[in-house]
């Protein structure tokens, strides 16, 4: 059995397969998943699992070079934004896009991780870095 915090097989496998510059999106329950992009659906009930818990678990295994957020997040300030700020040292450089541009970016993702989060704009695109 694994020693790290992340137990979900599909998510762990996806992270292990990421290369430098690959994109992994963590999204709220309402974020559309583009056709052809793998969906890792963790949603169980509204709010479970929440965005922040999934982000922490992903960061336990993923090296992140930079991250992208929707500009609308700054106006709504969902609870996940507090966690993003707390984890900023593990997230690299920040970029802001409109929510529509964020959805276009998600077309290039290796996978979208769907959480049970129901707070608007609780989405982040993580761009993989390297550990060397």
Curated annotation (Swiss-Prot):
Domain of life of the organism encoding this protein: Bacteria
Enzyme nomenclature, EC number: 5.4.99.62
Active-site residues, as the UniProt record annotates them: 20
GO molecular function, one term: intramolecular lyase activity
One Pfam assignment: RbsD_FucU
Keyword terms, alphabetized: Carbohydrate metabolism, Cytoplasm, Isomerase
GO biological process, one term: D-ribose catabolic process
Reaction(s) this enzyme catalyzes, per UniProt: beta-D-ribopyranose = beta-D-ribofuranose
Signal peptide: none
Keyword Metal-binding (UniProt): no
GO cellular component: cytosol
Residues reported in the UniProt entry to bind substrate: 28, 99, 121-123
Transmembrane segments: none
Function: Catalyzes the interconversion of beta-pyran and beta-furan forms of D-ribose.
Quaternary context: Homodecamer.
Protein's name in the database: D-ribose pyranase
Lineage: Bacteria, Pseudomonadati, Pseudomonadota, Gammaproteobacteria, Pseudomonadales
């Amino acid at each position: 059995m694994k020693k790290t915090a992340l137990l979900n097989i599909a998510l762990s496998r996806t992270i292990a397969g990421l290369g430098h510059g690959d994109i992994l999106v963590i999204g709220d329950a309402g974020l559309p998943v583009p056709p052809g992009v793998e969906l890792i659906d963790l949603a169980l009930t509204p709010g479970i699992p929440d965005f922040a818990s999934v982000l922490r678990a992903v960061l336990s295994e993923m090296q992140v070079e930079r991250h992208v957020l929707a500009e609308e997040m700054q106006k709504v300030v969902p609870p996940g934004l507090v966690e993003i700020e707390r984890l900023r040292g593990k997230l690299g450089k920040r970029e802001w896009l409109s929510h529509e541009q964020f959805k276009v970016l998600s077309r290039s993702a290796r996978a979208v991780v769907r959480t049970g989060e129901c707070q608007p704009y609780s989405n982040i695109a993580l761009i993989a870095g390297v550990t060397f």
